[in-house]
UniProtKB/Swiss-Prot annotation:
It comes from Nitratidesulfovibrio vulgaris (strain DP4). Residues 473-482 have a biased composition (Basic residues). Residues 633-636 are annotated as: G3. Residues 419-429 have a biased composition (Gly residues). Residues 687-690 are annotated as: G4. InterPro entries: EF-G-like_DII, EFTu-like_2, IF2_II, IF2_N, P-loop_NTPase, Small_GTP-bd, T_Tr_GTP-bd_dom, TF_IF2_bacterial-like. This is Translation initiation factor IF-2.
């Protein structure tokens, strides 16, 4: 340690924290410190101390947060209660002044009571959101003394014009004799409601008029109706619940002066109609029908002349649709004889806003009210003249805005043949609806071909109510005809400008959803460089771009595997347990990775590998004195790049093995890059320290150039010097791994569905598809359903790395799983799911997507791909291959290595590749495509061999990857094996033979021509016939070994495994020269 650096353990002791806590702080600050002996730069110390102190202060502050939340909740309640007490006297005082305008009183009572008019139609989602807070009891509040005249408020509804269908009574402002002082909102199931969107009632106060109150009629108190805001409703309810004495007195006064007509609109709640109410409605409807057929007078009282009728609101309270004196008036039932509107008859001389309507005029049935904004109680049109009536008011009011709300288009019509109260009935059933029969045809003419038509069906949420459907036709004759509602042709509203797309959508379907013509979308696609037809499928990304051009949003619908595979919530800290570290051993080929693992496992894996090199990725669970460790052994050969990358991605720690006598090699650099890309910490093990030429300093120097600086040199990379052969330094290496794992705090939740990655996959002849799975979280049990890549399955059996059968596997446990539907790709994520149906659904969805991606790649034709397909016949030399390997990872490595061998003159085309034994279908495929079958660690059956001979298919077998690559290179040189040429060197004549014990016969020769070399091949000729062909074992001149003997000299020559040498034989020397066929 230098003067300007401090060790981690010393700083931890100084700050009074554990090394583990300090390690976490350093990790958050991106200060590299792997062990407690790591050093920290002096300039970093102030920042670290500030961070540790800030964390202590932050922990102290967090402890008080829950109390603050609780206290805030109490303050809200107190404030609401105080506000309620303060408002009651003000409201009474305000109500005592009759000349004060109602808007001012409403603002003084509670300013949020007056809501802004809604500018756009509400969706059902908005209605539900508004409806939810109304489930709590809502207390009615009296804001004036009973002896004062009631302020008259204008009610603007956000609902369509109603039929006399059953409707939920609003919450009463006054309390009936049988009810409690404040009536709460009933549950939805108990309300006889029309099946329509629930909308909040919004009240706009109007100017009071003393003349509006008739003599002899005591009016009930009228309440300013609050908008249905959840926060305000809850606050008011809390304030009343706290016990407001003044409110209690007002409620008692209210009980004495009960008026059955006065109701307070609070909110309309949708529910199914009550069967008892429906039966009563049907009876009343039949009576009304009989009266209408008889042409009788419709009771209800004659409207006084010139009565003041502020729009929608009568003096004395609110009159919802279908509500008449005496309570609920369902479905066109007659009003009791002599009945009157709740607010009383209109006195003479009253003012009705609007221009005077001509005497005797009437508003024909079915005439739509003009769209537009009505403000301030103004009613366009004219007051109905004396004795006038509105016959057959069955036309729906078109969509239009009134202040305080809106009336959606297509609302239910008013009951046919029902004149306004005070009017006189016309013909039975009223006058027929002009144009009612032709509205459907008219709306069809208005439809534009390129615009979306929105039809609100009769049985939909805005059509006939449920009790209308139960009643059936409403009459006979012309009245019996079904109501024909116009189909509104309109572009989608802004809130509805969304199209729903699955993984892909056709151009025609997209045009239909957007209300456009298909050629408009095709025009945009052409501008994007996509040649599309009306039936072309667009992926979701392209559809999003196209929809954006027209101002639409894309909503992805359909099956989503994320709903099943993505964890719903994070694991709670108390559910996490410590898991063993996953350590990947990486390095260059022949640097001793597997031998080092053998020494740790005390086994012999290397002996089982062909050629002594690792060609699979192996997972091993090792129990050491320092705890359990999971090792992944990766291949070092250059062809296994993908395997090394995969090993780095699913590991916690990488041990980089470098031979002390060899130094840093190409695959060593690649392993370092893979580990850095995966963000995995690296520990270096310098192996082969027992060799004479070991030079660990050279390794440290070369690795420092790659960014791995040893701790001895002031860096943070841990170096361990080991020898797999002598087991030197293994305990130190295991201890360093255990310390590093402790710093990383590796934890996982074992009590959840298993999730992991496939390390290796293969096809076993007896057990079917197998995969080595490293479980990373959860516990995998026998019988669990799972999905992996495009395959689903159920765990039939599990085996550990020793081949023993196990029932379950926890986090950081490698197991071999049996039960796949096919051979999965190595590196795929393995996820356990609830049942087989979900697994199969996800697998099928992935398979369809994969096929679509493959088809999309094939359909894309560029200039380069087009020209590459038109090579000349002389140059179009292609080597077709069918690759079969034992495991999926090896197949991937071989495929990649073989593809790299392609040159401009010879292309390699892999017709098919798969894991498992060579089958009959492989032979037939190779025969049809003139391909060579390459088998790696697999063998065919005798039947398959016979078929191969019949089909003249060449099968090559390999067990070492670099031999496979070399032979393919040779085959590419001339589409055949390398050419070997024999070169003549010289001749020697045998003049004498000598028999040497333990060696054999030695020929004494004289070189007659050329020369004879020691490594040359020889051919023994006797009377011109070749008797022996072999090699020279010894070549001596006198007693000295020589490399060659020139012409004219004598020598002694021994032949390999041949002693029948006779005087007079001729020995011809030659050598074989390999020459690759030129292309």
């Amino acid at each position: 340690m230098t003067e300007n650096k401090t060790k981690v353990k010393d700083l931890a002791a100084e700050l009074g924290v554990t090394t583990k806590e300090l390690g976490q702080v350093l990790k958050d600050m991106n200060i590299s410190a792997k062990t407690s002996t790591s050093v920290i730069a002096q300039e970093d110390l102030p920042r670290i101390k500030e961070r540790v102190q800030a964390q202590r202060d932050g922990g102290a502050r967090k402890e008080g947060n829950p109390d603050v939340i609780v206290r805030r909740r109490h303050r809200d309640g107190d404030r609401a209660s105080a506000r309620a007490e303060a408002k009651a006297p003000e409201q009474e005082a305000t109500a005592a002044m009759p000349e004060t305008s109602a808007p001012e009183r409403a603002e003084e009572a509670d300013k949020p009571a007056v809501a802004k008019p809604a500018k756009a139609p509400e969706t059902e989602a908005h209605a539900r959101a508004r409806k939810e807070p109304q489930a709590e009891p809502v207390k009615a509040r009296i804001i004036r003394r009973p002896d004062e005249p009631a302020p008259v408020a204008k009610v603007v509804e956000a609902a369509p014009a109603e039929t006399p269908a059953p409707e939920a009574p609003a919450v009463k402002a006054t309390v009936t004799a049988e009810a409690a002082p404040a009536k709460t909102v009933e549950p939805e199931s108990e309300r006889p409601q029309a099946d329509k969107p629930a909308t909040a009632r919004v009240v706009r106060p109007a100017t009071p008029d003393a003349s509006a109150v008739p003599d002899g009629t005591s009016s009930a108190p009228t309440l300013p109706v609050r908008s249905a805001e959840p926060s305000d409703t809850v606050e008011r309810a809390d304030a009343d619940a706290d016990g407001d004495d003044d409110d209690a007195q007002q409620r008692r006064r209210k009980k004495k002066r009960r008026q059955p007509e006065a109701v307070v609109p609070q909110v309309r709640v949708i529910s199914r109609p009550d069967p008892a109410a429906v039966a009563q409605q049907q009876m009343q409807q039949q009576a009304a029908q009989q009266q209408r057929e008889a042409g009788g007078y419709r009771p209800g009282g004659q409207r006084p002349e010139g009565g003041y009728r502020p729009e929608g609101q009568r003096e004395g309270g609110y009159r919802p649709e279908g509500q008449r004196e005496g309570g609920y008036r369902p479905g066109g039932a007659p009003r009791p004889e002599g009945g009157y509107r709740p607010g009383g008859p209109r006195p003479e001389g009253g003012y009705r806003p609007g221009a005077p309507r001509p005497e005797g005029g009437y508003r024909p049935a079915g005439g739509p009210r003009p769209e537009g904004q009505r403000e301030g109680g103004y009613r366009p049109g004219a007051p109905r003249p004396e004795g006038g009536y509105r016959p057959a008011g069955g036309a729906p009011r078109p969509e239009g805005q009134r202040e305080g709300g809106y009336r959606p288009a297509g609302g239910p019509p008013r009951p046919g043949g029902a004149p306004r109260p005070g009017g006189f009935g016309g013909a039975p059933g009223g006058m027929p609806v002009p144009g009612a029969d032709g509205r459907g045809d008219q709306s069809k003419k208005k439809r534009q071909k390129g615009r979306r038509t929105v039809d609100f069906q009769a049985d939909g949420p805005r059509g006939r109510s449920d009790d209308d459907v139960m009643r059936g036709p409403r009459g006979r004759g012309k009245r019996g005809k079904k109501d024909v509602r116009p189909a509104a042709t309109q572009p989608l509203k802004a809130i509805k400008r969304k199209i729903k797309v699955d993984e892909a959508i056709r151009v025609a379907d997209m045009a239909h959803q957007m209300g456009l013509k298909a050629n408009e979308i095709i025009k945009v696609l052409f501008g994007l460089g996509v040649m599309a037809t009306i039936n072309q499928s667009l992926d979701i990304d392209t559809a999003t771009v196209v929809a954006g051009e027209f101002g639409y949003e894309v909503e992805k619908v359909g099956f989503s595997e994320d709903d099943y595979l993505v964890p719903k919530e994070e694991d709670a800290p108390e559910t996490l347990v410590t898991r063993p570290p996953v350590v990947t051993i990486m390095g260059h080929v022949d640097h001793g990775k597997t031998s080092l693992l053998d020494a740790i496992r005390k086994s012999n894996v290397t002996a089982g590998e062909a050629g002594g090199i690792t060609q699979h990725i192996g997972a091993y669970h090792v129990t050491t004195k320092k705890g359990e460790i999971v090792f992944l052994d990766t291949p070092g050969h250059e062809a296994f790049t993908a395997m090394r990358a995969r090993g780095a991605q699913i590991t916690d720690l990488v041990v980089l093995v470098v031979a002390a006598d060899d130094g840093v090699m190409e695959q060593t650099r690649e392993a370092v890059n893979h580990s850095k890309a995966a963000g995995v910490p690296i520990m270096v093990a310098v192996n082969k320290m027992d060799k004479e030429g070991a030079n660990p300093d050279r390794v440290i120097r070369e690795l420092s150039e790659l960014g791995l600086v040893a701790e001895d040199w002031g860096g943070d990379t841990i170096f361990a010097k080991v020898s797999a052969k002598t087991r030197e330094g293994l305990d130190e290496l295991l201890e360093l791994i255990a310390i590093q794992a402790e710093i990383l705090e590796l934890k996982a939740n074992p009590d959840k569905a298993a999730r992991g990655h496939v390390v290796e996959a293969k096809l076993d002849k007896g057990r079917g598809p197998l995969a080595t799975v490293l479980v990373q979280e959860g516990t995998l049990r026998q019988g669990d359903a799972f999905v992996c890549g495009v395959f689903a399955g159920r765990v039939r059996a599990m085996f550990d790395d020793q081949g023993r059968k196990v029932k379950e596997a926890g986090p950081s446990t490698p197991v071999e799983v049996q039960g796949f539907d096919g051979v999965v790709e190595a590196g795929e994520e393995f996820v356990s799911v609830a049942d087989d149906k979900v697994a199969r659904r996800i697998a099928e969805s992935r398979a369809v997507k994969q096929r679509e991606r493959e088809l999309a790649k094939e359909s894309k034709v560029t200039l380069e791909t087009f020209l590459s397909r038109r090579a000349d016949a002389a140059e179009a030399l292609t080597l077709n291959l069918v690759l079969k390997a034992d495991v999926q990872g090896t197949l991937e490595a071989i495929s990649e290595a073989v593809r790299k061998l392609s040159t401009e003159k010879v292309k390699i085309n892999i017709i098919h590749g798969g894991a498992g034994a060579i089958t009959e279908s492989d032979i037939l495929l190779a025969s049809a495509s003139d391909a060579i079958i390459i088998g790696f660690n697999v063998r065919p059956t005798s039947k398959v061999k016979d078929i191969a001979e019949q089909e003249n298919v060449d099968i090559r077998f390999y067990d070492i990857i670099y031999k496979l690559v070399d032979e393919i290179k040779s085959a590419m040189a001339g589409m055949l094996a390398p050419v070997q040429r024999e070169v003549y060197l010289g001749q020697a004549e045998v003049r004498e033979t000598f028999s040497v014990p333990k060696i054999g016969v030695i020929a004494g020769c004289h070189v007659a021509d050329g020369k004879v070399t020691r490594n040359a091949g020889v051919r023994l000729l006797r009377d011109g016939v070749v008797v022996y062909t072999g090699k020279i074992t010894s070549l001596k001149r006198f007693k000295d070994d020589v490399r060659d003997v020139q012409k004219g000299y004598e020598c002694g020559m021994g032949l390999e495994n041949f002693n029948d040498i006779k005087v007079g034989d001729v020995i011809e020397a030659f050598e074989m020269v390999e020459e690759a066929a030129t292309l």
